[in-house]
């Protein structure tokens, strides 16, 4: 280890290794031979026992056991009588003992962890090794005789053993007793060795020749990093099987792209043989003509793999295609990688990794078997005497006693040379005893005592109660206390009230010192006495000590950084801590019995840091989004709102003019003017109209700020505070906040606002609205009864009607309140002074929804499943609920409480994973100098802009110059920080994309650089080096999750359905532009959109895009392209409840495979008696045999076929439909008998373009809350595959859709003749199901119809082919039935576009579109979940987590690196290795990025200490010890665990050199009241 330490330790790295038996003996101070602990009479430790003083040290300080030597002067002496060394009893916490085991024992971690390390190394299954270790089976080693040596070496699964002379490859067999007796027991052949138990395993492990093993395995996996460039004779000879597969891949590609080799037939060669012989340089290829020659024929004749490439590109050029040879290279590589994923190769790679681990680390395999067992120091497994003569002991002592007892018994049996079977049994029991000690319950049943499993060594490490999480990461500290909090409105913002008795206890040592200094006490003892008596001098000293000494307050749960802040204590009477009301929001504290903890920072550095960094006045802004956290709330907001309210006409003092604040305030106090009167006031040189209340508010504003002349509610107040912070800085803002608090409280008190039941005004129109709604629902029921709409539609429409009614009542209620007047205190007030209204509108308490429930109507309630209960609650709380209504509403209320309990845990666990994955990301340097960046654009969802560009680039550093797109002038330069002004300017210039620097593209070696991170949002300046941005990111994402889950029950389950959007309106004036709009005109002359990705934009006169709206398929367009529109014009509307299948051409209709009770069912509604024909397959088999479709046949005989997905409802008039019995050829054929079905047939029916053929009802409306959202966040961060994945196109190209089936049947209904055609896997079917074809028409490229007839296809689904004529690339996708296709024949798609519905799989996006698109996708998806909840989190926090998910790469070709093919390594490690190989000159490794979920990323971090303390402790430690992993102690977690300063904040190396010189007392006294220092 290097001696240069980190923090307080003389080392900078920690390496984990396996301990050899000699290591264990060297740690030990003696062997423990007896299981005894303490003597029951003398209570002294027994000699040679588990607590032996001779081995572990004296029980009393500086005193031997027999008492002969006592006192410090004998230190180091060993007593002759009892053999105990005289020293401090502390050594009993650090001295080890050991137990010499009578027989070797397998360490269970290396036997039972998955995959088993010993099993992997010996190439045996875990179960086999276990059977050997527990004496159930024999391990037989088969050595080769001389003839077999070479054969054994080549065979897979053999193992090299070195007996000290030579290395032989042997086979291992695990056989049971019977087989052993039969085959090997009496064999005189010398080639077999055998044994049982850990002994034989140890023997084999100690002989393994790691070098030879590694060499063989490397040879085995070497071909799997081959590419086209490596093909040649050597490869052909060495790796026959793989090579043949690759030749076939090349041949297939040549055929597919029409590249022919000529002259093969005369020479009797197949294409594969020719390619093979060209690659191995046995044949020549004329690259001009394509002739294959036996001899060299001059310049044009080439041989080897290059010949194929040159010829291929020449041919493609003649065909006017782009000559892409990359495609063949890619296919070869894909074929190789497919082989890698084979189990055999994966296994070889796993063994190789383990062998390399042992080689590199210097561990020996036989050390996984224990000969000596260490005994941990006795003070770490204490035995405590309780009163009543009983003892409480650690479980470990019991486990050790079992081991010692069994070990001693085994020794005795071996000395007595007992029968083999007894010894074997005893050895097995010893093995089990050691297993229980190391990891109880890992194998078989755990050892129990009084029905409770004993805690083994592993249990002391793992889980929440283990050493890592309980004692190392979550220590309890002294100088702390906790108490209930109460509000302290008279405090200043940097103060808190600390109870005197509490302060006295916390500051005791300081008080003692002060008492001595002032001469009140002569000694510490005296001072103690004074403090106990609590004399007046004590309180005097306490006051002095506490002054200027900050304390930290913390409220659990500590969800983010502002949950711990520093305050200056003010001593108060009583026992409750007083908290300033403004700092409640960051703590999320209220005063209904919350408790808080107090901590005292002791050191001078700690006090300074508390003052400068943690003081509450320094934490006004949130690190998550940069908006103020410290906010006036409740009464303060109400008071401010009340006094800045609009003027009331006709009040006392109206029209008076004032010139100064003092005049107004005096007039107000004397009652000459009413607070809401309209007065004139002089601001600067201008006169303005305002009210005395607003003048009063402006009198507390910082100087030089513009006059605020508006009604201030919570939102405006927040905006005002943000603007002030920008304008006047921290200190002035804090002072202002304190003044707002005072004034707000005062004014709300003087206003005397209170609420009475009369303030809840039930709107007069409520009855009318409800009558109308009831009428509408009745109509909907009638339509349903008549069968015009389906049950699902009925449900959706009813929900919609009630949502609208609820909103209407609520709107009416607020309007009535606003327009009414009331007499209060003899004065007339407008309705906006209604106290409840004021509370809601100002944002002081409650919201419109809650008032709606109090005085409007409660509205719709949600069920557990998230659906709405159809019957709304019509009453409100003022009128009271009926029994039924009360019963319905218990539903939602209970759901709220149940959710809260479950989801808090879920969100907490998510936060923990996020912290663990990002904990080691800190700001490590000022600027990494990268030129890369991340493109920011507005987030648009469903056609509306959810997050504007200016919000996304705010606080970021530009990656390149930003130019005005119209004038070309440079608005901002690279590396400039974007503040509000600049963001606004960029947005105004109409720029749509801006490249900013991002943690995702940062090139800092460890962590992130300050420029790529941008602003520290809580300080509004570039982040300082050392900031722990990873943890801040995790907290910023996790905290709202926890908050949101806690928020559901406040509305009491009264759900609000999101109003369904059924049209789009313009927001601005301009000219209409269509994007991808394809429309047809229907019978009514309306334009119907039939494009799947259409959008309508509005441009201004310069042609700049102002807005863009997506338009769904089937929408009615209400404007024309190029039309001028005003703001508020409707552009398009559609039916929000259904998706339509629309006839795009006119013609006759034919139904195909629409068979009653087979492919469609008649849904007859019990209530309505009407029927609807709905597509649904009765049996899964039917879906294979039939494909329901509607065909429209035009006059010129062209067919347009529309597939009907499941749940589609036919839209054909009932009188045009008849049922006919017909023979079904497909079913008859599959059941091998004649089967008839009832087919639906359409009588003469012509459709016009735009007619609706069928409709698919949409999913029902559900309540969307983050609870639905949190699992989505988890799905994204864990990189899980979504439940319904979308199929994405991998290339750009045109879509072709074919049926996918094994056979095509042509059936002639007139003659009854049937012909079958078997279809090969790679053939494309050129006809559609149900189509009528003529004899001679092609069915596939090779098969032709032999009869006229109708086509029948037993379809599995579709083959969707994307073909790119330019590159010649083609990809095919299988789409199963029931998945909805988003593309049509002939559509053009881009790589990464979805072909079917569903959620895109992140890994697919990474593979197809690359890392940048994936980053954009993840960022947008996860932001949307939070945005739907109205939660603001800055992008950079998500970016840091996404950076961690993408920090690994998978090695495709190891080159000359130390990596293996398929291994996943950190980008950093790969970079280091590349640099090394560049210096030495060798083949560089190639890798591809992989996406890793946060749990896996946290477990595979380079720091084993951090991973072990996260999850799966056993596995992490086992892996780390075998590989001899080194922890560099870079992250925060590992440093906390070993007790070091963390490498963040002031713990960064840069600050190491800074020393704090304790100033004289005098200087300390003059410290300023509130913190004015800026962060250094």
Swiss-Prot record:
- The domain of life for this entry's organism is Bacteria
**Subunit architecture:** The RNAP catalytic core consists of 2 alpha, 1 beta, 1 beta' and 1 omega subunit. When a sigma factor is associated with the core the holoenzyme is formed, which can initiate transcription.
| Annotated positions binding Zn(2+) 2 | 928, 1002, 1009, 1012
Which processes are annotated in GO (biological process)?
DNA-templated transcription
The record's HAMAP family line, in alphabetical order, gives: RNApol_bact_RpoC
How far does the signal peptide extend, from start to end residue? Answer: none
| Cofactors that this protein relies on | Mg(2+); Zn(2+)
The gene that this protein is the product of is rpoC
Q: Which InterPro entries match?
A: DNA-dir_RpoC_beta_prime, DNA-dir_RpoC_beta_prime_bact, RNA_pol_asu, RNA_pol_N, RNA_pol_Rpb1_1, RNA_pol_Rpb1_3, RNA_pol_Rpb1_3_sf, RNA_pol_Rpb1_4
Write the lineage as a comma-separated list: Bacteria, Pseudomonadati, Aquificota, Aquificia, Aquificales
Q: What is this protein called?
A: DNA-directed RNA polymerase subunit beta'
Q: Which organism is it from?
A: Aquifex pyrophilus
């Amino acid at each position: 280890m290097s001696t240069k330490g980190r923090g307080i330790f003389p080392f900078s790295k920690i390496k984990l290794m396996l301990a050899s038996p000699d290591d264990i003996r060297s740690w030990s101070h003696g062997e423990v031979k007896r299981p005894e602990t303490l003597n029951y009479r003398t209570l002294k430790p027994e000699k040679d026992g588990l607590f032996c003083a001779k081995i572990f040290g004296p029980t009393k300080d500086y005193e031997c056991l027999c008492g002969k030597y006592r006192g410090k002067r004998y230190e180091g002496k060993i007593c002759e009588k009892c053999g105990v060394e005289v020293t401090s009893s502390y050594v009993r916490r650090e001295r080890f003992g050991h137990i010499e085991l009578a027989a070797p024992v397998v360490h269970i971690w290396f036997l039972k962890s998955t995959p088993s390390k010993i099993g992997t190394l010996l190439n045996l299954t875990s179960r086999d090794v276990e059977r050997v270790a527990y004496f159930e089976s024999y391990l037989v080693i088969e050595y080769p005789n001389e003839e077999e040596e070479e054969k054994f070496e080549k065979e897979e699964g053999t193992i090299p053993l070195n007996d000290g002379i030579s290395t032989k490859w042997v086979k291992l067999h695990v056989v049971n007793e019977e087989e052993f007796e039969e085959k090997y027991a009496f064999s005189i052949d010398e080639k077999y060795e055998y044994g049982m138990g850990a002994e034989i395993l140890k023997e084999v492990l100690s002989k393994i020749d790691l070098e030879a093993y590694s060499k063989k395995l490397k040879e085995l996996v070497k071909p799997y990093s081959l590419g086209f460039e490596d093909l040649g004779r050597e490869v052909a000879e060495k790796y026959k099987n793989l090579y043949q597969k690759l030749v076939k891949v090349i041949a297939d590609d040549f055929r597919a792209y029409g590249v022919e080799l000529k002259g093969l037939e005369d020479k009797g060669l197949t294409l594969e043989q020719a390619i093979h012989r060209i690659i191995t340089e046995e044949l020549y290829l004329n690259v001009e003509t394509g002739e294959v020659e036996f001899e060299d024929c001059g310049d044009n004749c080439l041989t080897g793999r290059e010949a194929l490439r040159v010829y291929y590109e020449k041919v493609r050029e003649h065909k006017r295609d782009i000559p892409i040879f990359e495609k063949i290279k890619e296919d070869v590589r894909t074929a190789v990688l497919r082989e890698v994923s084979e189990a055999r190769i994966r296994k070889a790679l796993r063994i190789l990794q383990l062998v390399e681990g042992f080689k590199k680390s210097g561990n020996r395999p036989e050390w996984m078997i224990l000969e000596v067992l260490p005994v941990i120091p006795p003070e770490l497994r204490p035995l405590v005497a309780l009163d009543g003569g009983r003892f409480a002991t650690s479980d470990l002592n019991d486990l050790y006693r079992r081991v010692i007892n069994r070990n001693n018994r085994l020794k005795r049996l071996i000395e007595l040379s007992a029968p083999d079977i007894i010894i074997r049994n005893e050895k097995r029991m010893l093995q089990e005893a050691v297993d229980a000690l190391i990891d109880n319950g890992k194998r078989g049943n755990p050892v129990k005592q009084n029905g409770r499993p004993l805690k083994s060594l592993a249990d002391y490490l793992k889980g929440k109660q283990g050493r890592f999480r309980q004692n190392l990461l979550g220590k309890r500290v002294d100088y702390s206390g906790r108490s209930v909090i109460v509000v302290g409105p008279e405090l200043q913002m940097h103060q808190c009230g600390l109870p005197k008795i509490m302060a006295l206890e916390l500051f005791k040592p300081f008080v003692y010192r002060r008492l001595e200094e002032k001469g009140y006490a002569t000694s510490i003892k005296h001072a103690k006495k004074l403090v106990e008596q609590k004399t007046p001098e004590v309180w005097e000293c306490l006051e002095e000590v506490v002054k200027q000494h900050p304390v930290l307050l913390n409220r659990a749960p500590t969800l983010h950084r502002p949950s711990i802040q520093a305050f200056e204590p003010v001593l108060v009477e009583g026992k409750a801590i007083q908290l300033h009301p403004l700092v409640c929001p960051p703590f999320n504290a209220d005063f209904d019995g919350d408790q808080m903890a107090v901590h005292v920072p002791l050191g001078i550095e700690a006090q300074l840091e508390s003052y400068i960094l943690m003081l509450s006045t320094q934490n006004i802004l949130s690190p998550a989004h940069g908006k103020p956290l410290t906010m006036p709330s409740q009464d303060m907001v109400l008071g401010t709102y009340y006094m800045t309210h609009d003027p009331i006409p006709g009040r006392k003092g109206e029209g008076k003019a004032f010139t100064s604040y003092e005049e107004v305030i005096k007039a107000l106090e004397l009652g000459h003017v009413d607070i809401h009167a309209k007065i004139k006031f002089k601001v600067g040189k201008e006169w303005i109209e305002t009210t005395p209340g607003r003048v009063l508010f402006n009198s507390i504003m910082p100087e030089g700020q513009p006059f605020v002349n508006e009604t201030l509610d919570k939102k405006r107040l927040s905006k005002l505070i943000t603007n002030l912070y920008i304008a006047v800085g921290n200190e002035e803002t804090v002072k202002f906040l304190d003044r707002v608090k005072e004034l707000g409280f005062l004014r709300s008190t003087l206003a005397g606002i209170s609420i009475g039941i009369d303030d809840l005004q039930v709107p007069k129109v409520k009855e009318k609205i409800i009558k109308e709604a009831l009428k509408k629902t009745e109509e909907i029921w009638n339509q349903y009864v008549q069968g015009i709409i389906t049950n699902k539609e009925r449900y959706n429409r009813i929900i919609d009607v009630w949502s609208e009614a609820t909103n209407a009542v609520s709107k009416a209620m607020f309007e009535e309140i606003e327009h009414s007047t009331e007499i209060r205190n003899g004065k007339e007030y407008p309705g906006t002074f209604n106290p409840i209204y004021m509370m809601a509108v100002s944002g002081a308490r409650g919201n419109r929804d809650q008032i709606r429930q109090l005085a409007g109507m409660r509205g719709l309630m949600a069920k557990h499943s998230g659906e709405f209960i159809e019957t709304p609650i019509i009453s409100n709380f003022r009128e009271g609920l009926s029994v039924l209504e009360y019963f319905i509403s218990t539903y939602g209320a209970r759901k709220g409480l149940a959710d809260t309990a479950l989801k808090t845990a879920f969100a907490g666990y998510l936060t923990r994973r996020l912290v663990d994955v990002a904990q080691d990301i800190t700001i490590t340097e000022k600027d990494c100098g990268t030129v890369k960046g991340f493109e920011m654009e507005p987030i648009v969802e469903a056609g509306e802009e959810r997050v504007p560009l200016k919000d996304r680039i705010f606080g970021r550093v530009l990656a390149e110059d930003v130019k005005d797109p119209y004038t070309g002038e440079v608005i901002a330069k690279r590396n400039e920080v974007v503040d509000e002004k600049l963001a606004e300017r960029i947005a105004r210039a109409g720029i749509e994309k801006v490249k900013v620097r991002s943690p995702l593209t940062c090139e800092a070696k460890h962590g992130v650089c300050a420029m790529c991170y941008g602003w520290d949002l809580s300080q509004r300046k570039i982040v300082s080096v050392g900031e722990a941005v990873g943890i801040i990111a995790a907290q910023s994402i996790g905290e709202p999750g926890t908050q949101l889950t806690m928020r559901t029950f406040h509305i009491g389950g009264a759900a609000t359905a999101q109003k369904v959007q059924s049209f789009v309106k313009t927001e601005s004036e301009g000219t209409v532009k269509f994007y991808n709009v394809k429309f047809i005109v229907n019978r009514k002359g309306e334009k119907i959109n039939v494009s799947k990705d259409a959008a309508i934009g509005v441009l201004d006169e310069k042609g700049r895009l102002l807005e863009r709206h997506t338009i769904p398929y089937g929408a009615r367009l209400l404007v024309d392209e190029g039309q001028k529109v005003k703001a508020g014009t409707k552009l398009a509307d559609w039916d929000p409840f259904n998706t339509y299948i629309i006839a795009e051409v006119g013609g006759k209709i034919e139904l195909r495979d629409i068979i009653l009770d087979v492919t469609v069912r008649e849904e007859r509604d019990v209530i309505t008696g009407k029927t609807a024909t709905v597509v649904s397959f009765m049996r899964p088999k039917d879906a294979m045999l039939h494909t329901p479709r509607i065909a429209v046949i035009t006059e010129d005989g062209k067919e347009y076929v529309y597939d009907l997905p499941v749940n589609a409802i036919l839209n054909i008039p009932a009188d045009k439909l008849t049922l006919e019995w017909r023979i079904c050829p497909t079913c008859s054929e599959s059941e091998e008998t004649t089967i008839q079905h009832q087919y639906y047939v359409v009588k003469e029916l012509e459709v016009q373009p735009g007619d609706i053929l069928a409709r698919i009802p949409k999913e029902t409306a559900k309540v969307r809350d983050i609870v639905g959202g949190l699992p989505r966040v988890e799905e994204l961060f864990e990189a899980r595959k979504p439940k319904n994945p979308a199929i994405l196109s991998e290339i750009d190209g045109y879509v072709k859709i074919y049926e996918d089936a094994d056979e095509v049947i042509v059936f002639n209904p007139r003659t009854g003749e049937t012909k079958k055609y078997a279809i090969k896997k790679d053939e494309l079917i050129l006809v559609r199901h149900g189509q009528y074809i003529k004899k001679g028409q092609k069915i596939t490229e090779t098969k032709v119809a032999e009869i006229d007839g109708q086509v029948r296809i037993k379809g599995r689904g579709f083959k969707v082919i994307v073909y790119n004529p330019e590159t010649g690339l083609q990809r095919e996708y299988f789409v199963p039935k029931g998945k909805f296709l988003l593309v049509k024949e002939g559509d053009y798609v881009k790589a990464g576009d979805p072909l079917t519905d569903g959620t895109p799989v992140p890994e697919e996006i990474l593979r197809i579109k690359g890392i940048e698109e994936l980053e954009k996708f993840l960022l947008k998806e996860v932001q949307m979940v939070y945005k739907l909840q109205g939660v603001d989190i800055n992008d950079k926090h998500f970016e840091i987590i996404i950076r961690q998910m993408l920090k690994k790469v998978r090695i495709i070709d190891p080159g000359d690196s130390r990596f293996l093919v398929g291994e996943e390594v950190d980008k950093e490690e790969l970079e280091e290795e590349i640099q090394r190989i560049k210096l030495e000159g060798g083949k560089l490794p190639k890798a591809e990025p992989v996406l890793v979920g946060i749990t896996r990323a946290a477990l595979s971090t380079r720091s084993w200490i951090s991973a072990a303390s996260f999850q799966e402790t056993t596995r992490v430690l086992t892996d780390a010890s075998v590989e001899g992993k080194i922890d560099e102690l870079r992250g925060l977690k590992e440093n906390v665990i070993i007790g070091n300063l963390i490498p963040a904040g002031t713990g960064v190396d840069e600050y190491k050199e800074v020393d704090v010189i304790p100033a004289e007392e005098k200087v300390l006294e003059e410290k300023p009241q509130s913190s004015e220092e800026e962060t250094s």
